[in-house]
């Protein structure tokens, strides 16, 4: 997902407390995908209610968001709109991967291979419209704002940070920098120990921040050149050049100046290059949004999560209390200004 330029970026470890009282524009689809991939049972089966409806995303949204606001963080979730036409090939490939993974998951379960089953189950995750609508509803009754982007959610989130309506973008993908995001937080949705896919190895997943200007200075390039590097490697809108990884792409762009010169040197072309560039430099965004946190509605949370989706009443009530306490602390901070 996104572009593979992570090895070039300057990453810095931070704590949740470092984001206290900061507005974080969260890439909603990216975050929901993480919840759907990770919150699963041993055989890879997602959490479901008594009717068989998937609820892993609701669990992740409720409990992780409660932890974030409890830490003083002010999240606003940004949902993707209609994808650009140039993304259709990538979306088709992802669909094929999901369908293949789903078949392999069923086979692995039948064979009793739980490790393989879990791996393939993660790759079969899909954020559908019902999941999106349920997530928006849950955020609303939690008192957490969400915004519908006209196109790419990461582009909208980056725009909001550039406008100073938010302080950070939160996403696992690196596309945010191509859209101009000054600061991006990674691993905000899930931290702690994670098992590497296909390996009996666990790694610590820690919160980290990447700053665009710091990276550009270290690489001695500008943002347009970073976009060109990403296009060389491959983005959601193009496959990239054969056998060109991020480090090779960096050398090529620094040597030749831009991607047009690289393509001339290699006697190659990338179809729709200028359109691809424009999707990053002039993305479709909206100014029609409001960021407002409100008190959670405990009654609606109980009805939606416990009565309709079989969540533990005790756990939901505790999460609601955490959200209420954070909302009260936020209001107290605001009152100090007036």
From Swiss-Prot:
SMART domains referenced in this protein's UniProt entry, alphabetically: HhH2 (SM00279), XPGI (SM00484), XPGN (SM00485)
Mind listing the GO biological process terms from this record? Answer: DNA repair; DNA replication, removal of RNA primer
Specify where the region named N-domain lies, as residue ranges: 1-98
- One matching Pfam family is XPG_I
The entry's free-text remark on the cofactor is: Binds 2 magnesium ions per subunit. They probably participate in the reaction catalyzed by the enzyme. May bind an additional third magnesium ion after substrate binding.
Question: EC?
Answer: 3.1.-.-
**Which keywords annotate this record?**
DNA damage, DNA repair, DNA replication, Endonuclease, Exonuclease, Hydrolase, Magnesium, Metal-binding, Nuclease
Segments passing through the bilayer: none
- What SUPFAM superfamilies does this protein's entry cite? 5' to 3' exonuclease, C-terminal subdomain, PIN domain-like
- Function comment: Structure-specific nuclease with 5'-flap endonuclease and 5'-3' exonuclease activities involved in DNA replication and repair. During DNA replication, cleaves the 5'-overhanging flap structure that is generated by displacement synthesis when DNA polymerase encounters the 5'-end of a downstream Okazaki fragment. Binds the unpaired 3'-DNA end and kinks the DNA to facilitate 5' cleavage specificity. Cleaves one nucleotide into the double-stranded DNA from the junction in flap DNA, leaving a nick for ligation. Also involved in the base excision repair (BER) pathway.
**Family per record:** Belongs to the XPG/RAD2 endonuclease family. FEN1 subfamily.
Q: What is this protein called?
A: Flap endonuclease 1
Q: From what organism does this protein derive?
A: Methanosarcina acetivorans (strain ATCC 35395 / DSM 2834 / JCM 12185 / C2A)
